[in-house]
């Protein structure tokens, strides 16, 4: 009987020591503080949402505003604001590289931003509609000029005409025209006039002969044969 009673007493939980009591007390206090912080955070979210709902409502009623930029917010606040804007039937975007500096802009549906405007905000620049319109016009002008140049095709230069114009002030228009015809007829063999591929005269010799023929036509003399 004594052994049975001793076994029962030894199996019973011993009373907590002073150290265990202190640990449990701190755990209860920490749990209470955590619960209080959670309640405060929840209340702050509720108040923040009410404040955003009022600002969005004022924005909608103000006919002079088409967009509104908010101060930088943390991720949770931005999420709440996006939700409020969506419920109100508006459009919203977040901009900014660093998370601490990101902000929200809201737009009325009928004044939704273009891709160019959004790109400007993403680059951290202010949107200037006038500059954007000027840039668009310059781009369209450059495109039209390219299309017109493509339709006209490459410029074709006439070698005979160029030769005639180049030497007309030296040997006269008639002689220059004759030289141009000679070069054009013999272009298969190069730029030097050729007679059955045996004429090895230079351009200057050919021009001298043309001058001589011109003088003879004017004076009525007869041109001596050339070797």
Swiss-Prot record:
InterPro entries: R3H_dom, R3H_dom_sf, R3H_sperm-antigen, SPAG7
Short sequence motif named Nuclear localization signal, residue ranges: 35-51, 122-139
Region (Disordered): 1-46, 118-160
Keywords: Acetylation, Nucleus, Phosphoprotein
UniProt tissue specificity: Detected in fetal brain.
Residue positions, PTM N-acetylalanine: 2
Classification via Gene3D superfamilies: R3H-like domain
Localization (cell): Nucleus
SUPFAM superfamilies: R3H domain
Protein name in UniProt: Sperm-associated antigen 7
Organism annotation: Homo sapiens (Human)
Lineage: Eukaryota, Metazoa, Chordata, Craniata, Vertebrata
Gene name of this polypeptide: SPAG7
């Amino acid at each position: 009987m004594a052994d049975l009673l001793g076994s029962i007493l030894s199996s019973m939980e011993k009373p907590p020591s002073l150290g265990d009591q202190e640990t449990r007390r701190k755990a209860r206090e920490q749990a209470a503080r955590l619960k209080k912080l959670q309640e405060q955070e929840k209340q702050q979210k509720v108040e923040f949402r009410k404040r955003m709902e009022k600002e969005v409502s004022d924005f909608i009623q103000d006919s002079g505003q088409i967009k509104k930029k908010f101060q930088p917010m943390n991720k949770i606040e931005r999420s709440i604001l996006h939700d409020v804007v969506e419920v109100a039937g508006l459009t919203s975007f977040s901009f900014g590289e660093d998370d601490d500096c990101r902000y929200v802009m809201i737009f009325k549906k009928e004044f939704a931003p273009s891709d160019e405007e959004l790109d400007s905000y993403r680059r951290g620049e202010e949107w200037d509609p006038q500059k954007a319109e000027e840039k668009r016009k310059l781009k369209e002008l450059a495109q039209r000029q390219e299309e017109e140049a493509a339709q006209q095709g490459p410029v074709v230069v006439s070698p005979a005409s160029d030769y005639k114009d180049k030497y007309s002030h030296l040997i006269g228009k008639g002689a220059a025209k004759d030289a141009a015809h000679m070069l054009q007829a013999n272009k298969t063999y190069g730029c030097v006039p050729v007679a059955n591929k045996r004429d090895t005269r230079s351009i200057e010799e050919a021009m001298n002969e043309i001058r001589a023929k011109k003088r003879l036509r004017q004076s009525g003399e007869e041109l001596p044969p050339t070797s």
